[in-house]
Amino acid sequence: MKGLALCLRQAVTIGCCLSFGVVAAEIELKRKWELYEINGRNQSELRRELNSKGPVNPDSGKRFDARTDWKLGWEYKYETKQGRYRLSSHSIKVTATIHFPKWVNMETGNPLAQRLWLVYIHNLKRHEQGHVELAQRAGQVLSDRLSQLGAFGTRIEIEEAIKKKAQEVTRIHKALHQDYDRRTNHGKSQGARFP
């Protein structure tokens, strides 16, 4: 039933976009991995390295084992008819940068630490993928909101409306990322806990 409702909502959105002359947007995802290196032979050495080298959350000032930064970019074209400005096409670019640990001397680590690390890294990737999916959703929501923009009297008005929608979507999705981290205890409830 949920799938049917989603399909109907998407069909209505597409239908509305086509009736207003807005071409469906292309949404591009660019995913970048930024690895930071850690060394150690056992769990406690690795934990010390994670605690001292992990990426810092700019909002809280705390270090975490991994972090996903994201941003939205957009390009658009508009047309004028009878002195009114209307969006004719747009594209959205979602950039997600995942800051992630790399155990560089894993082959010299003790076997238990290696096994625990592999499970941990798998679960940490899964948690960060959740952030990437939220960022993709933000791109889709921005696209939908831009497709629903009406006509404006000036070029400045349409550009301000686009900027306002982007800021609104970014603010809402930033809160969703914070809620995701709160609900998962920054991935710990998903098994992203070491040791």
Give the residues covered by each predicted segment.
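Metalloprotease/metallohydrolase-associated module, dominated by Zn2+-dependent proteases
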Residues: I27-T108, F152-P195
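Bacterial N-terminal signal peptides that target proteins for export
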Residues: M1-V12
